[in-house]
Amino acid sequence: MYRFYVSSYAKGKEKGLYVCTLDETKNELHLNKHIPTEDFPSYVIKKDDFLYVSLKDARVGEGGGVASYHIEEDDLKQLSFYNSHGRSYTHLCLSPDQKYLFTANYHVGATAAFPLKDHKIGDKLSVVHHHGSGIDLLKRQTSPHAHYV
């Protein structure tokens, strides 16, 4: 049996995180639990018994950010949430010693670092706002877009 996690941008009550399993002996996928979230979960990192999740703002400037969860069998217990007030993170990365969480923000072209203590996300330590533009200035390359960190 393999357990895995799915993030969903679904509208209404369906948005959130899903705990699923794959039963290789029967070639079956199972949806074990839905964990609702206020914002749209996006990028997910699983490390040991913890999930780190980027959340896209679903509350018009009031939400978005990053959250950490403790994995408890077929459930997730939220440990922390950093509200980015409308800013959503495209990609996440953990430091090898798991003391820091790094984020990339596509929409504002920035990267940031957060401290982790007992897998809880602390206040932002540092932000780097990138500068520049692409060759297509009429459409979508008028500013930087961080894709990955």
Give each language-model segment a name.
Residues 1-2, 48-49, 97-99:
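Short coil/turn segments that connect the beta-strands within blades of beta-propeller domains
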Residues 43-46, 94:
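Residue-level recognition of a conserved intra-blade site in WD40 beta-propeller repeats
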Residues 13, 39-40, 62, 88-90, ...:
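Beta-rich catalytic cores
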Residues 16-18, 64-67, 110-112:
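A short loop-to-beta-strand structural motif that recurs across blades of beta-propeller domains
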Residues 6, 52-54, 103:
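Residue position within the beta-strands of beta-propeller blades
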Residues 1-12, 16-22:
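An edge-strand/N-cap motif at the start of beta-rich repeat modules
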Residues 10-13, 57-61, 107-110:
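Short glycine/acidic-enriched loop and turn motifs that connect beta-strands
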Residues 76-148:
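Asp-box/WD-like beta-propeller blade repeats and closely related beta-sheet repeat scaffolds
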